[in-house]
Amino acid sequence: SCMKAAPMKEVSIRGQGSLAYPGLRTQGNLGTLGGPNDATRGLTSLADTFEHVIEELLDEQQVIQPSKENKDADLYSSRVMLSSQVPLEPPLLFLLEEYKNYLDAANMSMRVRRHSDPARRGELSVCDSTSEWVTAAEKKTAVDMSGATVTVLEKVPVPKGQLKQYFYETKCSSKGYAKEGCRGIDKRYWNSQCRTTQSYVRALTMDNKKRVGWRFIRIDTSC
């Protein structure tokens, strides 16, 4: 996010950030996870209803405000994956964003779509960012919704073994305009700063009383 900057409509620069879908909730528990056949059936079912689910998520109008103490935190988003190996693709969150852009362009003429292509207009993001999957071993601790520091568990037990928790984090790039201010902002009139912001995601954690449970924690999700 670009702090203390001119309105984007005045500088014609498109910023990038994470989309949040408050209607997206984790359902079920670890006991519902089965073997490979169960996973295959689950993926098939998801594929059959993928478009319908996306439409519902995009139509979700509920807004959940972060607490005043966590004013740098965004809404809930899904950036957590349980896997035996490092995920090769970004999470569903980014697929939803791409699909929304497709829907927005579907009602445009070909001529308008051509001119709406950022590459044709020479648009750049206001702030440069980097995204990558990180493990709980790299995070170690995080802040939950109550402001308490909790330990992020590296592995999640399942009926047939253990899976690692992976978090898809996005933060401001250490190179480029991060130190010089936001791209496209006239430095003669405005002071600006690229700053990493956070969102809440659900993860398996342990508090200082050794109680293990699923809690919403803050991770880096946009710049």
From Swiss-Prot:
The lineage of its organism: Eukaryota, Metazoa, Chordata, Craniata, Vertebrata. Pfam families: NGF (PF00243). GO terms for biological process: cell surface receptor protein tyrosine kinase signaling pathway; modulation of chemical synaptic transmission; negative regulation of neuron apoptotic process; nerve development; nerve growth factor signaling pathway; neuron projection morphogenesis. GO terms for molecular function: growth factor activity; nerve growth factor receptor binding. Glycans are attached at N107. PROSITE patterns: NGF_1, NGF_2. The keyword Secreted applies. Belongs to the NGF-beta family. Promotes the survival of neuronal populations that are all located either in the central nervous system or directly connected to it. Gene3D superfamilies: Cystine-knot cytokines. One of its GO terms (cellular component) is axon. Disulfide bonds join C127-C194, C172-C223. Keywords: Cleavage on pair of basic residues, Disulfide bond, Glycoprotein, Growth factor, Secreted, Signal. Transmembrane segments: none annotated. Residues 6-114 form a propeptide. This is Neurotrophic factor BDNF precursor form. It comes from Calabaria reinhardtii (Calabar boa). InterPro entries: Brain-der_neurotrophic_factor, Cystine-knot_cytokine, Nerve_growth_factor-like, Nerve_growth_factor-rel, Nerve_growth_factor_CS. Its main location: secreted. Residues 1-5 form the signal peptide. It is found in: Secreted.
